Amino acid sequence: MTNEYGKVSSRTFKHMKKGLVFMANHNHIENIYALPHIGSGHDGLVFEYGDLALKLLKYDISKRSKDKLMTFEKASFFCRNLKLKRIEAPIDILLDEDGIFSGYVMHRIEDLASEKYVGTPIAKKPGEFTCGQLLWAASELGEDFSQLSSKGIKAKDINAGSFLYPADYVHLCDVDKYQLSKDSSLERENMQKYRYTLAILLYLQMGQGCSKEELKALNTWVKHCSNNPAFVKELSSDIGSCFSEPISELASHKAKVLLR
């Protein structure tokens, strides 16, 4: 069996083979393009496969390595070493019919805030979840980021598009740019990313209807939170009496205090 260092596609999916095989359990997919398409990014397409999500990667190995995207080495390491609660990482690898690395498998997360659920009884907006759910998510995300540090993985490229909102509030997706690292600053940087993640969750609510000047102030606040070791503790304290209240109310209160 050849490895990923054989060439895969160039910069499009035009020449990608349809048939794929799961590396661990040898499940065979005759035509991945026949599966429901549920997501896209600059580096791949995501398809629904039962309770799993399959990411078909774009580009050949040289470009993916150069741009620090997902590689066979990284995906294999994630599969072997991670068991996360809120960050969706690879759980298996996809090979094409020639045994060449072509993508990876994740748990599929139902994003109740996506267009798919608009107008349905179970649709949610990010701010409709409760402060208690935020606190629960914060605890489990903290465990996940600590696990990343213990395994030598640096979280990268977390942005608004990284968030999914299932019934238990929030999960992070798109770990393609996460890096294997031995940097002495790894733990500190991951904790900054953790605090940044929680601040962004509130920012997405606080920024609704804000002027450019107010958004600039909110951006400054997010940066402050990322560098404030006590931010998570302060946030937990803020939640206190409004445990069952929607996150949007907490965010609205914070925005009024910050922007007045």
Each model region followed by its residue ranges:
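C-lobe/activation-segment region of protein kinase-like
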Residues: 166-259
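Protein kinase-like catalytic core scaffold
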Residues: 52, 104, 171-174
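Conserved alphaE helix
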Residues: 131-149
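ATP-binding glycine-rich phosphate-binding loop
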Residues: 3-63, 68, 85-86
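Conserved hydrophobic "DFG−1" position in protein kinase catalytic cores
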Residues: 48, 108, 164-165
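Catalytic-loop of the protein kinase fold
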Residues: 145-166
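A conserved alpha-helical element in kinase catalytic cores
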Residues: 15, 58-98, 128, 132
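Conserved structural core of kinase catalytic domains
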Residues: 85-137
